[in-house]
């Protein structure tokens, strides 16, 4: 094939015919393409319409079913309405019955209000009675406090009376000591009288040991004046038995003999006795007296007397039932109660202490402190003696 610029050969179609044919072919191709595209669109539309028809058929069947259901529901609603109307009539009848019952309740309410007013009056009366009972309770409580105060006052008065008794006993003991010193002075003056009389001295020296022995053996002569009635201080107070005052007299006789052994004059012995501290009564409380004393017995003998002192033969004395500490404590303990007064009942004291509560414990602590002080005074007094 030759190009357009080449010389044209003879026997062939001209080029413009070829161009026209090509244009026709293109036009036909374009028409075919547009027709095919329109056919496809129409086919699609047909398919869509068919689907829409199917959907409308389905919707129609659904609507028919829905219509049948609605008809059934309308029938059921109609029946329900008829039933509700019957229930409404029943509720109306019940409402009338409730109205009648409400009227009855109003009547009952009025009756209850009347009863409440009566009960309120009763409550006010009971409150008045309660106030009276409270006043009575307060009055009895005041009486109880007054009774407690009276108990404490009685306890204090008993303590004061016991102290007064102890002071009286101390005064009697002082009188006893004065009488004892007078007897010692008379005993010191007796040898001088015997020497003046002459031949009667030997007879009196033989009689004197027997008299001393009888005095030591006879417990009634060694007792205090207020203890000679045979009254035992042991009573329901729980106090230990107060021994006789024989050890005190033996101790004083022993001190006298010791003073004569050392060659002391009667005036010097009297001055020594005056220099000794006086036995002050200690305030023993019931708590201290209740403690039993240890029962100790020691053998104490009077030493032999020299020949130049009264010219007495050595004479052994009887055994002392207690030592010096126990003896001094027995003397103080014997001073605690008078022979005409009974000791304080320990049960009464314990009841008062239990009744007062913590006050009894505080008094026990005070009694313990007084007991320690009393023991210290006793030890110091025994050392000085």
Curated annotation (Swiss-Prot):
Membrane side Lumenal: residue ranges: 34-385
Bias (Polar residues): 265-283
Chief place of localization: membrane
TM segment ranges: 13-33
Coiled coil residues, start to end: 44-193
GO cellular component: membrane
Annotated family: Belongs to the GOLM family.
Protein name: Protein GOLM2
Species this protein is from: Xenopus laevis
Gene: golm2
